[in-house]
A protein has these predicted regions:
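Short beta->alpha linker loops
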Residues: 32-33, 110-114, 135
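Catalytic domains of carbohydrate-active enzymes, especially glycoside hydrolases
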Residues: 94-110
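Alpha/beta enzyme core
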Residues: 83, 96-97, 118, 122, ...
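Hydrophobic faces of well-ordered beta-strands that scaffold small-molecule active sites
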Residues: 76-79, 104-108, 127-131, 155
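An N-cap/entry alpha-helix motif that binds or orients negatively charged groups
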Residues: 1-69, 174-194
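Active-site mouth loops of central-metabolism enzymes
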Residues: 77-89, 129-138
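Conserved, mostly hydrophobic/aromatic
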Residues: 21, 78, 99, 157
């Protein structure tokens, strides 16, 4: 069987829907509460139009720039996504390596499965670390020290962890801080082992 032809994000979404266990797919492809922000973000992206330029010299075009003093291939970065390792073994390492190959920053989530040290051991380029600001200051300081030691080039502060947003699909799927192994989840995991 040949690999599917991927031409856009929707193709990737459909591929993931069939290859990834439902609870993990829903985690990545949903938001909290009513998902109104998630839907608004998608709608805002649909409003962005690329403008074609004609009759101009494109011989020396380049997206290269600097972000916080670091040379990058284009002005984008991989945003922090918690628990990427749920979707693929060593998921964060794979994403960090891909970002490195493309010359863009990778941001490791505080909620990642791979550690800060794992990413540093498997990449050469500096990466960014997303830091949730929490009450336990000693824990925060230890995370910052680990990020420095792992050559993180930036801390991306996240301030919205005052309370966890209720993610309705995660609740339905039994995916929580302590996942509930329901029969439906176990069957889904067994049939989609990626």
């Amino acid at each position: 069987m040949s690999a599917p032809v991927i031409t856009n994000i929707e193709d990737l979404r459909e591929l993931a829907k069939h290859k990834v266990p439902r609870m993990f797919y829903d985690y990545a492809d949903s938001g909290s509460w009513t998902e109104s922000t998630y839907r608004a973000n998608e709608a805002d992206f649909q409003k962005i139009k690329l403008r074609q330029r004609v009759a101009v010299d494109i011989e020396k075009r380049s997206l290269k720039t600097k972000m916080i003093g670091i040379d990058v291939a284009m002005p984008v970065a991989i945003a922090p996504v918690g628990s990427v390792g749920m979707h693929s073994a060593d998921g964060e390492i794979k994403v960090a390596r891909a970002a490195e190959r493309f010359g863009i920053p990778f941001t490791l989530s505080t909620m990642s499965i791979c550690s800060i040290e794992d990413i540093a051991a498997h990449t050469k380029a500096p990466f960014w670390f997303q830091l949730y600001v929490m009450r336990d200051r000693a824990f925060i300081e230890r995370l910052i020290d680990r990020a420095k030691a792992a050559r993180c080039g930036a801390l991306v502060l996240t301030l919205d962890l005052q309370i966890f947003g209720q993610r309705h699909k995660d609740v339905r799927n039994g995916l929580s801080a302590l996942p509930k192994p329901t029969l439906a989840n176990l069957i889904n995991l067994a049939t989609k082992p990626r």
